[in-house]
Amino acid sequence: RGAAALQAIPHCVLLKGQGAKGAYISGLCTSPEHRRQNIGNSLMAQAHFHLYTLGTTFATLIPAEPWLHDWYGKCGYTKDIKCLPAPKGFATSSFEDYDRWQRSHDCILLNDADQFDIACKDYGLDPDHYLSQQEPVQGMIRIINAKKALELYASENTGMEMTVLVTGDRHIPANNCYYTIAHGNVTTSHEPRPDAQVMTIQQLSTFIFGSQQPVMCLMLN
C-alpha cells in the first residue's frame, strides 16, 4: 500500500488573454502510519518539480481544512485565488455557453470540455454540493516556473524595468535566481545585482497578481 498520493490535473490558466500551463492539485493524502514523517511535503516537492519539467507555470488547489492553509503556505502557495460558485444552471447549459462565461474573466483556471462534462455528471450525483456554495471559497496558487510567470507579467507591463531576486524556493531550486524585466522581456542571471528586489516565491505570486485575483470554478476536491 502506498504511503501517500495526490493527483495533478492539467488546466490552462488564462491571464489577460494569454494562456499558460496550469495544474490543479487534489486528493493529497498520507496513510495514518506514515504521518508526521514529512512524506506529504516530500510528495509535494516531487510533484512541483515534475510540473516544472513539464513546462507548467502555475499550480492551484483548495485546502480541505482551514489549518492546511499554513501547511500549503510552507509549500510555496498563497491565498491569491478563489473558487467561484458554479454558474446558475451550468449543468443544463452547453460547454460553449460555459466557456464564454469563464473566458469573460481576466484571470481564470480554465476547464476544457471534458472537465466540464465531468463536473456536470458530478452535479447529477450530488447537486446539493454545488447548490450549497453561495460564496467564493478560498483557494491557493503557487508559481511553478518563475520565469514563465514573469514573462506573462512583463508582456502586460512593457514599461516596467526592474530586477527581482527570487530566493528560498526549496521545492524548485531553479527558480532561485535574478530576473531582469525590461521592454516586455525577462532575462535571468546568477550574477549579483545590488538593485534587485528580493522576493520569496510566495511574494512573487502576490506581486504578479496584485489586485487582480485569479479565480477557478467547478473544481472537484
Describe these PLM feature segments.
Residues 1-3, 26, 65-67, 73, ...:
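Core nucleotidyl-transferase/polymerase catalytic module
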Residues 2-11, 22-29, 60, 130:
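Conserved beta-strand in the GNAT
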Residues 11-17:
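Active-site cofactor/substrate anionic-group-binding motifs, chiefly glycine-
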Residues 27-30, 36-49, 74, 128:
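Conserved acetyl-CoA-binding loop-helix of GNAT-fold acetyltransferases
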Residues 44, 51-64, 131:
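Conserved GNAT acetyl-CoA-binding A-motif
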Residues 76-162:
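Amide-forming acyltransferase catalytic core, primarily the GNAT-like/NAT-type
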Residues 134-221:
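C-terminal functional modules
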